[in-house]
Amino acid sequence: MSSLPALDLFLSKYQQAYVEKLDEQPRYYAQEQESDCVVGEMDSDGAVFWQAVVRQTPGQFDNVETALELTLCAEINAFYGRHFSAPLFFDSKWGSGELIQVWNQTDFEYLQQNIIGHLMMKKKLKQEPTWFIGVLDDEDKMLTVNNSDGSVWVEIPGEVQSSKLAESLNEFISLLTPRVTPPVKLIEESMPELDHPGIWQRMKLMWRNLRGK
């Protein structure tokens, strides 16, 4: 598996930032989804304390590559397949945002479905393949990796990558600062069973808007 030392360091700093500022680990509204990340019991409001953990069996994207007949940039396995974690909030010179991570194996499989959908849409639009790693808080801006060279860009759904942020995913993550913020309890519309809270709702809305164009 390709290594992303910047992600390992960011996860460590993330936990440390919450302990130093709030004297507690980060909390997440997991909607009663089980995860190896959970620390202790759910609180009275339904949130859980969590800490990122290294997966016993790393997640791989071989099935996605086979389905699409496409070789994916190796960093996708290190970014999504090494840990179980809640989404990660950050501050940066480009603004604040979130990095997508996977909460459990079901979440990982749902992620794969979404990446397949994203890559199929890029092919349909005759655009170069990219895969998403998060979102910026500014409107509908996705953070995506150029699958050809591994660089990180801003991308609007339905458009080509527009603003280059870093030459590599490792470099991009090294430029982020953990953002300490209370957990957000989302009031969501009824969704299929595989839909997940938080950042997934934002991704769903972006793709719904794209398909509606």
UniProtKB/Swiss-Prot annotation:
GO terms for cellular component: cytoplasmic side of plasma membrane. Keywords: Cell inner membrane, Cell membrane, Membrane. Gene3D superfamilies: Syd protein. It is found in: Cell inner membrane. It is a peripheral membrane protein. Interacts with the SecY protein in vivo. May bind preferentially to an uncomplexed state of SecY, thus functioning either as a chelating agent for excess SecY in the cell or as a regulatory factor that negatively controls the translocase function. Belongs to the Syd family. This is Protein Syd. The lineage of its organism: Bacteria, Pseudomonadati, Pseudomonadota, Gammaproteobacteria, Alteromonadales. The gene is syd.
